[in-house]
Curated annotation (Swiss-Prot):
One of its GO terms (cellular component) is cytosol. It comes from Escherichia coli O17:K52:H18 (strain UMN026 / ExPEC). This is Rhamnulose-1-phosphate aldolase. PANTHER family: FUCULOSE PHOSPHATE ALDOLASE (PTHR22789), RHAMNULOSE-1-PHOSPHATE ALDOLASE (PTHR22789:SF16). The lineage of its organism: Bacteria, Pseudomonadati, Pseudomonadota, Gammaproteobacteria, Enterobacterales. Disulfide bonds: none annotated. It catalyses: L-rhamnulose 1-phosphate = (S)-lactaldehyde + dihydroxyacetone phosphate.
Length: 274
């Protein structure tokens, strides 16, 4: 019998959650991570599945995700503990045939349930499937320290925030030319914040929750982690720059345009226009 804990997707989740913890982005039970799988990914591990998978209804049907398996982090679980006990802190779930709920096939032992932000994740998965033709498979939420700090001092406007991050590090425009979406402050763990996040995910692979954290989307765990890491590095640079009295010089609009042309990306027009 093959052990599911040695699968690429469980090992990938262990690495991503451990790295995020070591970065300081996921204190206590902060943060959540979901990865969309295919049936072929989980097929070799049926012998590991629960004999009687628990069924949990979704707060709203998501037919686009019907019959789709995911691996998810659990509600109230600490990222730092995933590596110690994957089965207690992670779960493989599969949405039912009409998208009305899901079965917990593996993991989430002792009656644990998926992350409270599952509505935001699933709604965002729906939008990123449409926006990327199914390429994006990962949604990651974490409390990236410097990005959060900037939401207290920068105007919480997509164009303004995006332009500042692009100027904070040359690679940013190349990595997220579509910019950073920003919500107003909202109560987490609700359908409302999930719907607002998904709406921004139609246009942006990064979405900031002011005074709280960031959502990122990408095709792989590495790409999604790297996306957030790149934005957070720029935010760290900006925090240092602002604390030293602000910018004396920076990357110009013309230089940003040249950067986009060199790497074949189209920068967010509203940020470029500032």
């Amino acid at each position: 019998m093959q052990n599911i804990t040695q699968s690429w997707f469980v090992q990938g989740m262990i690495k991503a959650t451990t790295d995020a913890w070591l970065k300081g982005w996921d204190e206590r039970n902060g943060g959540n991570l979901t990865l969309r799988l295919d049936d072929a990914d989980i097929a070799p591990y049926h012998d590991n599945f629960h004999a009687q998978p628990r069924y949990i209804p979704l707060s709203q049907p998501m037919p686009l995700l019907a019959n789709t398996p995911f691996i998810v982090t659990g509600s109230g679980k600490f990222f730092r503990n995933v590596q110690l006990d994957p089965a207690a802190n992670l779960g493989v779930v599969k949405v039912d045939s009409d998208g009305a709920g899901y079965h917990i096939l593996w993991g989430l032992t002792h009656e644990a349930v998926p992350t409270s932000e599952l509505p935001a994740h699933f709604l965002s998965h729906c939008e990123r499937i449409k926006a990327t033709n199914g390429k994006d498979r990962v949604i990651m939420h974490c409390h990236a320290t410097n990005l959060i700090a900037l939401t207290y001092v920068l105007e919480n406007d997509t164009a303004v925030f995006t332009r500042q991050l692009w100027e904070g590090s040359t690679e940013c425009l190349v990595v997220f030319p579509d910019g950073v979406g920003i919500l107003p402050w909202m109560v987490p763990g609700t359908d409302e914040i999930g719907q607002a996040t998904a709406q921004e995910m139609q246009k942006h692979s990064l979405v900031l929750w002011p005074f709280h954290g960031v959502f990122g989307s990408g095709p792989t765990l590495d790409e999604t982690f790297g996306l957030i890491d790149t934005a957070e590095k720029s935010a760290q640079v900006l925090v240092k720059v602002y604390s030293m009295g602000g910018m004396k010089q920076t990357i110009s609009r013309e230089e940003l345009i040249a950067l986009g042309q060199r790497f074949g990306v189209t920068p967010l027009a509203s940020a470029l226009a500032l």
